Swiss-Prot record:
Part of the 30S ribosomal subunit. Involved in the binding of tRNA to the ribosomes. This is Small ribosomal subunit protein uS10. GO terms for cellular component: ribonucleoprotein complex; ribosome. Keywords: Ribonucleoprotein, Ribosomal protein. The lineage of its organism: Bacteria, Bacillati, Bacillota, Clostridia, Eubacteriales. Signal peptide: none annotated. It comes from the Bacteria. SMART domains: Ribosomal_S10. One of its GO terms (biological process) is translation. Belongs to the universal ribosomal protein uS10 family. The keyword Cell inner membrane does not apply.
Length: 102
């Protein structure tokens, strides 16, 4: 595991939970002696849904809803087995989606 790199992508609808989770990951990796790059904020996806307010006619009256997906990227360079073990035991909130690539 000397020349490996772990790339972690985090996604969440709430940016505060996302930032707290990324700080937890960075602190855990740094405490085990690994070199960390990030968290890098990636572009936010914005999904907009337009619906009619009335059930039948009144097509001019519409309402728009949006949901934003915030993303962060963290690279852990040259992780030790201790780093991987600490990251596996890390407890993160339920609203955060995590993708890990080696």
């Amino acid at each position: 595991m000397a020349k490996q790199k772990i790339r972690i992508r985090l996604k969440a609808f709430d940016h505060t939970i996302l930032d707290q989770s990324s700080e937890k990951i960075v602190e855990t990796a740094k405490s085990t002696g690994a070199k960390v790059a990030g968290p890098v904020p990636l572009p936010t996806e914005k999904d907009v849904v337009t619906i009619l307010r009335a059930p039948h006619k009144y097509k001019d009256s519409r309402e728009q809803f949006e949901i934003r997906t915030h993303k962060r990227l963290i690279d852990i360079i040259s992780p030790s087995p201790k780093t991987v073990d600490a990251l596996m035991r890390l407890d993160l909130p339920a609203g955060v989606d995590i993708e890990i690539k080696l």
